[in-house]
Amino acid sequence: MSLSTEKKAAIVAEFGRDAKDTGSSEVQIALLTAQINHLQTHFAEHKKDHHGRRGLLRMVSRRRKLLDYLKRTDLALYQSTIARLGLRR
């Protein structure tokens, strides 16, 4: 259920400040968004996977907290990040 190393590296390269920037808020948000999108297809097929759904809700909550932090600290970066990811907030 996790992302491949190549996909993670591509996301870090797209959203990070450099190739090894994995800790910035926008990279973490992008990685969580990719994982959430991947899990949504899983739950379309496995409707009774309640343990996995708990993990999904935890990821959504963590992404929401990171988005709130980014909005509070850098509004322009927040707006560009949600536009690039296609999130509605």
From Swiss-Prot:
Pfam families in UniProt: Ribosomal_S15
Protein name as annotated: Small ribosomal subunit protein uS15
Highest taxon of source: Bacteria
Family: Belongs to the universal ribosomal protein uS15 family.
Xref: SUPFAM superfamilies: S15/NS1 RNA-binding domain (SSF47060)
NCBIfam families: S15_bact (TIGR00952)
GO biological process, one term: translation
Single Gene Ontology MF annotation: rRNA binding
PROSITE patterns linked to this entry: RIBOSOMAL_S15
Keywords of this entry: Ribonucleoprotein, Ribosomal protein, RNA-binding, rRNA-binding
Gene Ontology CC annotations of this record: cytosolic small ribosomal subunit
Assembly mode: Part of the 30S ribosomal subunit. Forms a bridge to the 50S subunit in the 70S ribosome, contacting the 23S rRNA.
Function in brief: One of the primary rRNA binding proteins, it binds directly to 16S rRNA where it helps nucleate assembly of the platform of the 30S subunit by binding and bridging several RNA helices of the 16S rRNA.
Keyword hit for Isomerase: no
